[in-house]
From Swiss-Prot:
Protein name as it appears in the record: Large ribosomal subunit protein eL32
GO biological process, alphabetically ordered: translation
Family annotation (InterPro entries): Ribosomal_eL32 (IPR001515), Ribosomal_eL32_arc (IPR023654), Ribosomal_eL32_CS (IPR018263), Ribosomal_eL32_sf (IPR036351)
One term of GO molecular function: structural constituent of ribosome
Lineage, highest ranks first: Archaea, Methanobacteriati, Thermoplasmatota, Thermoplasmata, Thermoplasmatales
Gene that specifies this protein: rpl32e
Alphabetical keyword list: Ribonucleoprotein, Ribosomal protein
GO CC terms in record: cytosolic large ribosomal subunit
Family assignment from sequence similarity: Belongs to the eukaryotic ribosomal protein eL32 family.
UniProt keyword annotation of Oxidoreductase present: no
Length: 134
């Protein structure tokens, strides 16, 4: 089983930047999420005419912006650097490139089939993200 993906120097550098950005990224919350019970914390763009949050006033929390996005070359990759592929059965493992991709076993897969998938992944040298703890 390959522990690390084959990445170029540039991809490794961008992955480090992405992981650092992810740690620093603030939690974007909806305007006045604390005020009303019916408001979830999940982000909603402020659209009010006099909204201080929409106007990006400094004493307000940060607003979602393109500058918080991770580098395009490594966007969507697992923090380890592997691209995730969802696997439902043993046949799905055949389409995975073990040098660049890892497998995530679907939540709907039962324990018996999960063990079969993990054994076959070990034989093929494929990294499984959500292994059953032994």
């Amino acid at each position: 089983m390959s522990e690390k993906p084959l990445l170029s120097k540039d991809e490794k550098r961008l992955l480090k930047i992405k992981n650092r950005m992810s740690r620093k990224r603030v939690e974007f919350r909806r305007q006045e999420w604390f005020r009303y019970k019916k408001f979830n914390e999940s982000w909603r763009k402020p659209r009010g005419k006099h909204s201080k949050l929409r106007e990006h006033l400094g004493y307000r929390p940060p607003v979602v912006d393109a500058g918080y996005r991770s580098p395009a070359a490594v966007r969507g990759l697992h923090p380890s650097g592997f691209a995730e592929k969802l696997v439902y059965n043993v046949n799905d493992l055949k389409s995975i490139n073990p040098d660049r991709e890892g497998a995530r076993i679907a939540s709907s897969v039962g324990m018996r089939k999960r063990k079969e998938i993990e054994e076959e992944a070990d034989n093929l040298g494929i990294h499984v993200f959500n292994r059953v703890v032994k």
